[in-house]
């Protein structure tokens, strides 16, 4: 299942405090509430149901989801594409073609509570659920009218992932910026490894496959999930031919990648959003993570069908478009833009390609991030990146690896004419 007209990886750029996180939270609220019932039916049209308790369970203060200056109703609209095989696996069989649903929900504030209404629900542009009437589709066509039971189950299908039989897994998950690896994540990975459920076990396999992309940084080996029965605690380690290295002893960038990949898979959600995946990662590692998302995780068996990323880096672009969020007098607006504009959108300089077929792109960003080609990294002795020092010379600056700089200090112990910056 996926949101129509959006790619597998959708990047949202915009200035700080414009509301990118609120946008992800709005998508989260939509999927969590769309299956809400009123008695044995749905709160359609002018009917409504109080969802304050559900919002609190999700971590929201119900009345604070509205604009505090002008708490007008919130309207969320979407078009969702469904997969026929997934519908069948969920036990949703119908004579009608049900591959697309257009849905509009409304949340409004009333005396300290939040009321939910299903304002519009149309299946494949032929059946209006709110009025419970067929639309004119095409001459000679006589589509079947879906039953009320099917419609209730269909909305539950949008809220919960039916591939997991023994637990309720939400369709949408949000991974915020507080995501350092934890014993809880290690336990989820361990449980996935040992799970009798095929879908769960696949996610552990996808984790191993995704992290194998970082073997040039970690060395030959693989991650293992261990459960210590005496401490009643799970841990992740990286096992080589000579040792098992606990995750907390690995570099902070690797830990961040483990956390992002692990959380992305262990949410078990169909659609996942990640806030600022670039945090604590050098630019080349951001690009590596993007490739892992694109090639090994998103849209493949055992992974989510779509992800949304909010980012201040251009490293995660993987399609022809990105989404720019901007302030306007009428409030924040999101527009689709060509990927060529991404660097400008986040304040990075446009790449300038030196002449020559094999010339590499180099630049210094406005945030002070330096990108150099692989050939220069080899000269520095840092093929996988690392610490560098800058020396000010007359009308120029030299970049050295930490090791090269230490060698200069050993050779010239009395030289203090250069200023380190």
Residue ranges of predicted features:
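Short acidic/polar mixed-charge low-complexity motifs
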Residues: 84-86, 99, 241-244, 395-396
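Hydrophobic, Leu/Ile/Phe/Ala-enriched alpha-helical segments that form helix-helix packing faces
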Residues: 31, 107, 207-218, 222, ...
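P-loop NTPase switch/coupling surface
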Residues: 1-180, 274, 279, 330, ...
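Short, surface-exposed charged micro-motifs
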Residues: 2, 104, 226, 361, ...
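Short amphipathic alpha-helical segments
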Residues: 19, 199-207, 285, 368
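Switch/communication elements of ASCE P-loop NTPase nucleotide-binding domains
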Residues: 1-42, 228-355
């Amino acid at each position: 299942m996926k949101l129509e007209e959006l790619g597998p990886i959708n990047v949202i750029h915009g200035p700080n405090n414009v509301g990118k996180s609120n946008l992800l939270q709005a998508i989260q609220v939509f999927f969590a509430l769309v299956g809400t019932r009123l008695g044995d039916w749905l709160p359609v049209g002018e009917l409504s149901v109080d969802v304050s308790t559900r919002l609190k369970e999700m971590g929201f203060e119900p009345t604070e989801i509205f604009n505090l200056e002008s708490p007008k109703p919130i309207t969320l609209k979407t078009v969702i594409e469904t997969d026929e095989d997934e519908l069948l696996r969920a036990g949703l069989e119908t004579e009608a073609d049900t591959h697309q649903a257009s849905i509009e929900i409304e949340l409004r504030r009333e005396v300290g509570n939040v009321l939910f209404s299903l304002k519009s629900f149309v299946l494949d542009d032929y059946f209006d659920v709110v009025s419970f009437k067929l639309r004119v589709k095409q001459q000679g066509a006589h589509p079947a009218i879906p039953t009320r039971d099917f419609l209730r189950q269909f909305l539950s299908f949008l809220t919960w992932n039916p591939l997991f039989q023994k637990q309720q897994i939400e369709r949408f998950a949000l991974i915020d910026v507080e995501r350092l690896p934890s014993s809880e994540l290690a336990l989820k990975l361990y449980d996935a490894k040992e799970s009798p459920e095929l879908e769960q076990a696949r996610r552990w396999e996808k984790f191993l496959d995704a992290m194998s992309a970082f073997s040039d940084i970690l060395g030959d080996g693989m991650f293992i999930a261990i459960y210590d029965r005496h401490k009643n605690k799970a841990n992740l380690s990286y096992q080589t031919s000579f040792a098992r290295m606990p995750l907390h002893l690995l570099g902070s960038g690797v830990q961040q990648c483990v956390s992002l990949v692990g959380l992305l898979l262990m949410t078990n959600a169909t659609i996942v959003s990640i806030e600022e995946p670039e945090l604590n990662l050098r630019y080349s590692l951001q690009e590596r993570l993007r490739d892992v998302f694109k090639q090994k995780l998103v849209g493949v068996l055992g992974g989510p069908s779509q992800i949304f990323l909010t980012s201040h880096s251009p490293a995660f672009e993987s399609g022809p478009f990105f989404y720019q969020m901007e302030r306007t007098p009428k409030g924040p607006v999101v527009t689709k833009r060509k990927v060529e504009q991404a660097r400008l959108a986040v304040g990075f300089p446009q790449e300038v390609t030196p002449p020559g077929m094999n010339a590499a792109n180099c630049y210094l960003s406005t945030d002070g991030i330096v990108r150099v080609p692989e050939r220069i990294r080899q000269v520095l002795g840092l093929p996988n990146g690392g610490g560098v020092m800058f020396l000010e010379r007359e009308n120029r600056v030299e970049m050295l690896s930490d090791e090269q700089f230490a060698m200069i200090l050993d050779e010239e112990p009395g030289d203090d004419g250069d200023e380190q910056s």
